[in-house]
């Protein structure tokens, strides 16, 4: 079994914001794999499917970003899954819009959703895809930036990054992660 988690904030007012790019990627994976995300468990919306006989779960925590761990850990426990089976997708201010980075483990890097996951899982040793959303513009706060929408000139780049991240997430279900990293980094 594999669990692919996209981080974001619940509610229509956050749709399309930089902070919700994890949700956008999970939605793209769902379209690629023909999985409906409409079931509810562990404070999250999820869907399930199979790839080459292996069960795959897609999860969008509904706890708000800074409490994401409150959804992911119970979900893993319910299905008796290990942290090794987890891939987390989230926004990263330190990467330009359109860039993605895959890592086998790492720190929270100041990201509150990742801080929550690390605290609730008791480890930072889980796979992740960081999707670049760039730094705030001069005079713009981090909160304004991540809860804001993409500028028109960024839309093509973020769309490509979402598609590439979805492709990488699908590859995670089929191949060793080191191979996936070598392909997509």
Curated annotation (Swiss-Prot):
UniProt signal peptide: none
Biological processes annotated in GO: protein quality control for misfolded or incompletely synthesized proteins; rescue of stalled ribosome
Active site: 19 (proton acceptor)
Keyword RNA-binding recorded: yes
UniProt keyword terms in alphabetical order: Cytoplasm, Hydrolase, RNA-binding, tRNA-binding
Subcellular location(s) of the protein: Cytoplasm
Annotated PROSITE patterns: PEPT_TRNA_HYDROL_1 (PS01195), PEPT_TRNA_HYDROL_2 (PS01196)
Sites where the protein binds tRNA: 14, 64, 66, 112
Annotated GO MF terms: peptidyl-tRNA hydrolase activity; tRNA binding
Top EC category: hydrolase
Matches recorded under Pfam families: Pept_tRNA_hydro
Family listed: Belongs to the PTH family.
Function: Hydrolyzes ribosome-free peptidyl-tRNAs (with 1 or more amino acids incorporated), which drop off the ribosome during protein synthesis, or as a result of ribosome stalling. Catalyzes the release of premature peptidyl moieties from peptidyl-tRNA molecules trapped in stalled 50S ribosomal subunits, and thus maintains levels of free tRNAs and 50S ribosomes.
Record text on subunit structure and interactions: Monomer.
Name of protein: Peptidyl-tRNA hydrolase
Biological source species: Halalkalibacterium halodurans (strain ATCC BAA-125 / DSM 18197 / FERM 7344 / JCM 9153 / C-125) (Bacillus halodurans)
Gene name in the database record: pth
């Amino acid at each position: 079994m594999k669990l692919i988690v996209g981080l974001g904030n619940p509610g229509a007012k956050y749709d399309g914001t930089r902070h919700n790019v994890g949700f956008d990627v999970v939605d793209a994976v769902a379209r690629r794999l023909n999985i409906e995300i409409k079931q509810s468990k562990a404070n999250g919306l999820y869907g399930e499917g199979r790839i080459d006989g292996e069960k795959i779960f897609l999860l969008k925590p509904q706890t708000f970003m800074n409490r994401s761990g409150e959804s992911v850990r119970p979900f893993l426990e319910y299905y008796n899954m290990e942290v090794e089976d987890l891939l987390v997708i989230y926004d990263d201010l330190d990467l330009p819009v359109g860039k993605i980075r895959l890592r086998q483990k790492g720190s929270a890097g100041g990201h509150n959703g990742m801080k929550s996951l690390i605290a609730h899982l008791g480890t930072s040793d889980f796979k992740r895809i960081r999707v670049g959303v760039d730094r705030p513009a001069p005079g713009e706060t981090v909160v304004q930036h991540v809860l804001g929408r993409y500028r028109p000139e960024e839309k093509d780049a973020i769309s490509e990054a979402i598609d590439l991240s979805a492709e990488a997430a699908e590859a995670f279900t089929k191949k060793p992660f080191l191979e996936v990293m070598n392909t997509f980094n």
